[in-house]
Amino acid sequence: MQLVLAAKYIGAGISTIGLLGAGIGIAIVFAALIQGVSRNPSMKDTLFQFAILGFAISEATGLFCLMISFLLLYGV
């Protein structure tokens, strides 16, 4: 029983590594937004819409990793 519990904790910890990628992805999206607005301020509204879309896609991958982690901890 202790081995199964340890495996659940290790699996949940490993599955949260995907959150690192989501954080980096969000940082890249908003860095590109700042760079794009500084180059062409008149495109601010259009660039912001694309940045929010990129943020949502990046955040979704992080939430999927977090969901798998919770499923490993509490679902099995």
From Swiss-Prot:
Main location as per UniProt: mitochondrion
Keyword Transmembrane: yes
Keywords from the UniProt entry: CF(0), Hydrogen ion transport, Ion transport, Lipid-binding, Membrane, Mitochondrion, Transmembrane, Transmembrane helix, Transport
GO molecular function: ATP hydrolysis activity; identical protein binding; lipid binding; proton-transporting ATP synthase activity, rotational mechanism
Annotated localization: Mitochondrion membrane
Biological process annotations from GO: proton motive force-driven ATP synthesis
CDD domains given in the database record: ATP-synt_Fo_c_ATP5G3
Membrane topology: Multi-pass membrane protein
Self-association state and partner proteins as the record states: F-type ATPases have 2 components, CF(1) - the catalytic core - and CF(0) - the membrane proton channel. In yeast, the dimeric form of ATP synthase consists of 18 polypeptides: alpha, beta, gamma, delta, epsilon, 4 (B), 5 (OSCP), 6 (A), 8, 9 (C), d, E (Tim11), f, g, h, i, j and k.
Record family assignment: Belongs to the ATPase C chain family.
UniProt xrefs under PANTHER family: ATP SYNTHASE LIPID-BINDING PROTEIN, MITOCHONDRIAL, ATPASE PROTEIN 9
Name this protein carries in UniProt: ATP synthase subunit 9, mitochondrial
Species assigned in the record: Eremothecium gossypii (strain ATCC 10895 / CBS 109.51 / FGSC 9923 / NRRL Y-1056)
Organism placement in taxonomy: Eukaryota, Fungi, Dikarya, Ascomycota, Saccharomycotina
Gene responsible for this protein: ATP9
